[in-house]
Amino acid sequence: MEYYSTHINKLIEQLSHLPGIGPKSAQRLAFHIMNMPKDQVEQLTSSITGAREKIRYCRKCCTLTDQELCPICSNPKRDASTIMVVENTRDLAAYEKTGKYERVYHVLHGAISPMLGIGPDDIRLKELMKRLQTEEIKEVIIATNSSLEGETTAMYISKLIKPTGIRVSRIASGVPVGGDLEYIDEVTLLRALEGRVDL
């Protein structure tokens, strides 16, 4: 039996596709949106549409940005000889919040996961390897999550880079196994970076 109108049901269904939003949360959000002033709803839809249309991948590091080069890659004060490889833009933001990492990044937008059918060609590895061939890189710090997929990705990247002679390191433990970097506090992230080990 349908309790709500077709439009409300459709809104609930669409909201429930968002990560971390189950049916109950989607229902709460839908009714909150229905009770918002019309101009706020229009601003919300405009922001979503605008972000989807304007946001793209940085030409260099592949993070999400609204410019050709993100603010980090276009900052001449950054040490561009060291690249930290992260799984997503949220992980990049977690390291940026520490205020201590003054080098550059490369965002993979995923991790290798044979179980989910995600292989090396499905993440931004080609772009990373191109950077290593065209830029003066001394070190690659692999900061993928400590999940099985993150470890698999780290080992794969290490094997790709080793023949180039570029130093490859992995952030130290301290980040819990299976933990996502975006949820780790700044002190733990800094210790993991400082305690990195060569692969």
Model region roles, listed by residue range:
Residues 9-13, 27-31, 42, 46, ...:
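Solvent-exposed alpha-helical segments within well-ordered globular domains of core cellular machineries
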Residues 26, 75-141:
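Extended interfacial segments that mediate partner engagement and assembly in macromolecular machines
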Residues 102, 129-141, 146-199:
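Long C-terminal interaction/binding lobes of large macromolecular proteins
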